[in-house]
Design a protein with these regions (language model features):
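Iron-sulfur (Fe-S) cluster-binding modules
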Residues: 1-94, 110, 255-265, 271
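Small-residue-enriched alpha-helical segments and adjacent helix-cap loops
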Residues: 64, 91-258
Length: 271
C-alpha cells in the first residue's frame, strides 16, 4: 500500500493566518436573558406579585416559556381598551406536559375543574398530546400551576428552548409492546427534563436549601437550547405520531411474534 503523501509548505509561504480569528459574536438578547437569570428564575415571583398590571416584564416572559406559560391578550378588546386608556386585556396560557398523552381519570377531573375555576372554561388537547389552559389571569396563575402539580402533573418544559413533550402511541393498553414503548417514552421525557430547582421553588413552594449540591444543567448548559426540540416514539405499522415531522424519532423494532421490543430504528432531522 502506498503511504499517505506528506505536504510541506512552500518555503516562501507563511504558515500563520493573515487575519486573526474572528471574535466571538455576542449572544442574542434571548440567550443573554437565559444566561444571566440563574437557572430560569429571574424576577418571576416579583412580577407575579405586581398587581399594578396584568402582564409580566419582557424578560420574565422569555423565562416563563420554560415553565410552560405564555402571556396573551384578548385581541378583540384591544381597540376598546385603548380608547378607554386601559392596558390590554392580558391573560396567560399554561401547557401541561403529558408524556405519551396519558393521564389518570383523577388528573383529568382535576384539570377540568381548574379550567372552569381558574381559566376560561376550556381545556384544549394539543396535536402533541399536551393539555392547555387559556385565559388565566395573573392573580390566578400561581394557584393554577400549583394545583396542576398537586394533581401530580406539571408544566415544566412544556414550552421553551428545551426538549418538549415526548409523544408516543396514544393507547399504551393496546398491547404489552405498546405499554413497553410508553415506559421508554416516559424515561426519555424524564431524562431530558431541565434539572433546575427553580420550577418547584416558584410554583410548588419548595424551600431554598443552603449548602446543598451546586445547581447545574448537565444536558442543556446555562443557555439551554437555541430552539425547541421534539422527540417521538412510534409503534409500527402506525405512524400516528408523524415521526418524520420531529427532530428525533424512535421506531420500535419487534420480534417475529410482534410482541417483544428488541430496540429502535432512529430518525433525525425532521421538523
Amino acid at each position: 500500500a502506498k503511504p499517505f503523501p506528506t505536504f510541506l509548505p512552500n518555503p516562501g509561504m507563511s504558515t500563520t493566518p493573515d487575519t486573526p480569528p474572528a471574535a466571538a459574536k455576542p449572544l442574542h438578547k434571548n440567550e443573554t436573558i437565559k444566561s444571566e437569570r440563574p437557572f430560569l428564575r429571574g424576577p418571576l415571583l416579583r412580577d407575579i406579585a405586581d398587581h399594578s398590571t396584568g402582564a409580566i416584564t419582557e424578560d420574565s416572559g422569555q423565562l416563563t416559556k420554560f415553565h410552560g406559560i405564555y402571556g396573551q391578550d384578548d385581541r378583540d378588546l384591544r381597540n376598546q381598551r385603548r380608547k378607554e386608556g386601559k392596558e390590554k386585556a392580558f391573560s396567560f396560557m399554561a401547557r401541561i406536559r403529558v408524556p405519551g398523552g396519558v393521564c389518570t381519570t383523577a388528573q383529568w377531573v382535576a384539570l377540568d375543574a381548574l379550567a372552569d375555576s381558574h381559566a376560561n372554561g376550556t381545556l384544549k388537547l394539543t396535536t402533541r398530546q399536551a393539555f392547555q389552559f387559556h385565559g388565566i389571569l395573573k392573580g390566578d396563575l400561581w394557584r393554577t400551576i400549583n394545583a396542576v402539580n398537586r394533581a401530580l402533573l406539571d408544566t415544566l418544559a412544556a414550552c421553551g428552548d428545551v426538549n418538549r413533550n415526548v409523544m408516543c402511541n396514544p393507547n399504551p393498553e393496546q398491547s404489552a409492546l405498546h405499554a413497553e414503548t410508553m415506559r421508554v417514552t416516559k424515561a426519555i421525557a424524564d431524562h431530558r427534563l431541565p434539572r433546575t430547582r427553580a420550577y418547584r421553588e416558584i410554583w410548588v413552594g419548595d424551600d431554598l436549601v443552603a449548602g446543598g449540591e451546586p445547581e447545574s444543567e448537565p444536558i442543556y448548559g446555562k443557555t439551554y437550547l437555541p430552539r425547541k426540540f421534539k422527540i417521538v416514539v412510534a409503534v409500527p405499522p402506525s405512524n400516528d405520531v408523524d415521526i418524520y415531522a420531529h427532530d428525533l424519532g424512535f421506531i420500535a423494532i419487534v420480534d417475529d411474534s410482534g410482541k417483544k421490543l428488541l430496540g429502535f430504528n432512529v430518525t433525525v432531522g425532521g421538523g
